[in-house]
């Protein structure tokens, strides 16, 4: 598995995202730049410039017409993917830590930071696609159609469950909440991770019936979207920043490493800066992929399950296209199932 090294950022990566077709990869970092890449060969398509602060988060609409970014300049920006122009700016009182389109692309949620007397919130906007040809995209709602305030512990990450039925949020105190996607009412709250160990990432399975969380408590959990039941736990030996569920094979990929500020002059091996592959069902670690010389801040997997990408504190995005042995790998029990 030879990685493709994408070098377009001067500072550490915050989030990377494949579009639904998997032909494009978007990356955002602390250097105020959004990059778009061809995922097949790592060629850079272009950049989206306009933010005045570090960009924390990115998401692309299911039809790849719009791109949303959230930044430390207290704005969410909506971009025309094709032309690179900014079609809408929403201002907030604090930084925006996560944006996510609903599964049908009709709504966009934004998670805002708790700071300067403002409570952390999740704002939901209705999204308009103009004539569907990528024109008239400027005509967007000014105000959110729904606002959820996190009075207990601020939300750090959030996403949509199947059909946009629930909004699932991960919190600073290690808990996971389920809100009604239409009314914003809190339905469920579960202490999924150790208390006061922040949840750094939430990513959903392809059908969005379950999701995986990555936490500072050195573990990742597979949780049901319907009732927040904890289905599986993947224990690592380092704080985790990101986790994703692979299609095609029953694996999960975890990314982490010793926190950037705790890294002294250790060797890359001691810092544990590797992508870890675990078996989704059996919870065993099955392999690691080295390469970054700093913690992995974000991982995402190609929607066809043929490749994965990781973005690190070192400012590089690495795209790995899986080889045949990856797809051939099976546990004995899985082989027996196939023989039947």
UniProtKB/Swiss-Prot annotation:
InterPro entries to which the protein is assigned, alphabetical: eIF3i, WD40/YVTN_repeat-like_dom_sf, WD40_repeat_CS, WD40_repeat_dom_sf, WD40_rpt
Lineage: superkingdom: Eukaryota
GO molecular function: RNA binding; translation initiation factor activity
Predominant location: cytoplasm
GO terms (BP aspect): formation of cytoplasmic translation initiation complex
GO cellular component: eukaryotic 43S preinitiation complex; eukaryotic 48S preinitiation complex; eukaryotic translation initiation factor 3 complex, eIF3e; eukaryotic translation initiation factor 3 complex, eIF3m; nuclear periphery
Gene3D superfamilies per UniProt: YVTN repeat-like/Quinoprotein amine dehydrogenase
Record's subcellular location: Cytoplasm
Assembly description: Component of the eukaryotic translation initiation factor 3 (eIF-3) complex.
Function comment: Component of the eukaryotic translation initiation factor 3 (eIF-3) complex, which is involved in protein synthesis of a specialized repertoire of mRNAs and, together with other initiation factors, stimulates binding of mRNA and methionyl-tRNAi to the 40S ribosome. The eIF-3 complex specifically targets and initiates translation of a subset of mRNAs involved in cell proliferation.
Name listed for the protein in its UniProt record: Eukaryotic translation initiation factor 3 subunit I
Organism: Aspergillus clavatus (strain ATCC 1007 / CBS 513.65 / DSM 816 / NCTC 3887 / NRRL 1 / QM 1276 / 107)
């Amino acid at each position: 598995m030879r990685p493709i090294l994408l070098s377009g950022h001067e500072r550490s990566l915050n989030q990377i995202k494949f579009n639904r077709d998997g032909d494009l990869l978007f990356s955002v970092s602390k250097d105020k730049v959004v990059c778009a890449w061809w995922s097949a060969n790592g060629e850079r398509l272009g950049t989206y410039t306009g933010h005045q602060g570090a960009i924390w988060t990115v998401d692309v609409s299911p039809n790849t017409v719009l791109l949303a970014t959230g930044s430390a300049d207290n704005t969410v920006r909506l971009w025309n993917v094709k032309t690179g122009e900014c079609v809408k700016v929403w201002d907030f009182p604090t930084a925006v830590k996560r944006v996510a389109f609903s599964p049908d692309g009709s709504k966009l949620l934004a998670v805002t930071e708790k700071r300067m007397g403002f409570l952390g919130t999740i704002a939901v906007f209705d999204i308009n696609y103009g004539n569907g040809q990528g024109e008239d995209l400027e005509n967007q709602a000014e105000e959110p159609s729904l606002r959820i305030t996190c009075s207990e512990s601020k939300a750090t990450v959030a996403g949509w469950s199947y059909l946009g039925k629930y909004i699932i949020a991960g919190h600073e105190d290690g808990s996971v909440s389920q809100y009604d996607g239409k009314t914003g009412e809190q339905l469920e709250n579960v202490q999924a991770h150790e208390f006061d160990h922040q949840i750094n990432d939430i990513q959903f399975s392809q059908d969005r019936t379950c999701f995986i969380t990555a936490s500072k408590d050195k573990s990742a959990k597979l949780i049901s979207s319907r009732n927040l039941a904890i289905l599986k736990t993947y224990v690592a030996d380092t704080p985790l920043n990101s986790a994703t569920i692979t299609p095609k094979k029953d694996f999960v990929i975890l990314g982490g490493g010793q926190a950037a500020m705790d890294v002294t002059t250790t060797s890359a091996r001691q810092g544990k800066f590797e992508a870890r592959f675990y078996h989704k069902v059996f919870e065993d670690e099955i392999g690691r992929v080295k390469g970054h010389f700093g913690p992995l801040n974000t991982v995402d997997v190609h929607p066809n399950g043929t490749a994965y990408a990781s973005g690190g504190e070192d400012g590089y995005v690495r795209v790995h296209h899986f080889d045949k042995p990856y797809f051939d790998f099976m546990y004995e029990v899985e082989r027996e199932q196939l023989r039947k």
